[in-house]
Amino acid sequence: MDLLTIAKHVADRVEVESARQKVPVAVTVIDIHGNVVLTHRATGAPAFSLELAERKAYTSALVGMRTADLVPLVQPGAALYPLLAVSGGRYSAIGGGVPLTSDGQVIAGVGVSGGTTEQDVAIVEAAVINPDPPGPTGPSAARVPVGYTEQKARVGDVVINYVRGGNGPTLVLLHGYPETWYEWRELLPEFGKQYTVIAPDLRGAGASDAPADGYDKKTMAADIHGLLTQLGLADGIRLVGHDIGTMVAYAYAAAHPSEVTRLVLSESPLPDEGLYQFPSLTSKGPGFWNFGFFSNINGLPEDIITGQEDIWVARFIDTLEVHKDAIGPAQVREYASHLHDPAHLRAGFEWFRAFPKDMKDNAEYIKTRLPMPVLAIGAQGSLGDLVPNQIRRYATDMTGIVIEDCGHWIYQEQPQQILERLRQFLR
């Protein structure tokens, strides 16, 4: 098991223990080379807690000891006093940091901060030193649902990560920004009862490669088609897209109309001249400000977000939610963990920077309207009927719906309503 996966399991256990004690905390995992593997601050944890958790994790990783045990060793004249004196403030002798070991060797340090020292120590030690064995319903056991496996395949010049499970006709699920295949995690068990499900990480997302280019939706759709062709599943697919995944799904269906039996396009406009009509500010508050912000090519988005990935993902998701906390801390950590890699952080913005190329491609695609049945979905608290109104021009057989009492994240905010709608349409 790789260190990032282990770190996510530890963070899940910290979340469970902090919830049990009703103490919101920050948790950081740092490897023995001083690199941040994962960092997350729960809602309600003090602003300073993230920095202190990092110091505790750094200290435990490099010293190989509990920070609570360091107090007598860092007093003036003691063995480790010079360590604190020259550390520039990065070391900490406050309880709440513990080393993470594998086969008796220290592989990382874990730091927790947000409560009293005693609470921080209790939470981190319950999570790392004496964790409850993960059961079939425990938070550490179910990142990939039962009946599914996570795999990789080389497709042309990229490696595509994907989750596969279930049995039946092929159902392909394409996620949006800043998500990964994990967007569909809660729905996968139900989908798997009727379909062979393929949920990939798009080029530049999750555990898929993040190359320098290829983020136009025509190329990203070709990645998915190549994957399905390798798997022998390209014929007669049902295809569902959300957000950026909607743009990729459309490009896929337009390029291979005879291979797609049903198409779902949800909560995203398709790149065409209509994009310029979306305001960044509305009478109800912020509009599509992110389209312009992400499209900056001078590195501004990357520079602002680097080092704040967890906060960025949590707050960005929150701005588009009607049902707050529909996407929880574990999901935020999952998405943010991949953005710590500069190539993946940049790739997410390249999806938006490619819109001019997408517009040119779609101007050709729209000359032949989609022949398959298309379900176009908007959310009442987000795009509403803008989605079906636009898709009507692209398809010959379109059904449009608006999910009530819902924000942009329709698959997490109204999962049961969405499941029923998709069951009716996809069958």
Predicted regions and their residues:
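Flexible, solvent-exposed loop/hinge segments and secondary-structure transition points
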Residues: 1-136
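Cofactor-binding loop segments of dinucleotide-utilizing enzymes, especially the Rossmann-like FAD-
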Residues: 32, 379, 405
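Hydrophobic residues on the short alpha-helix immediately C-terminal to a glycine-rich phosphate/catalytic loop
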Residues: 127, 187, 252, 421-425
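Conserved HGGG/HGGXW glycine-rich cap/lid loop of the alpha/beta-hydrolase fold
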Residues: 158, 163-207
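Catalytic histidine-centered segment of alpha/beta-hydrolase-like enzymes
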Residues: 406-415, 419
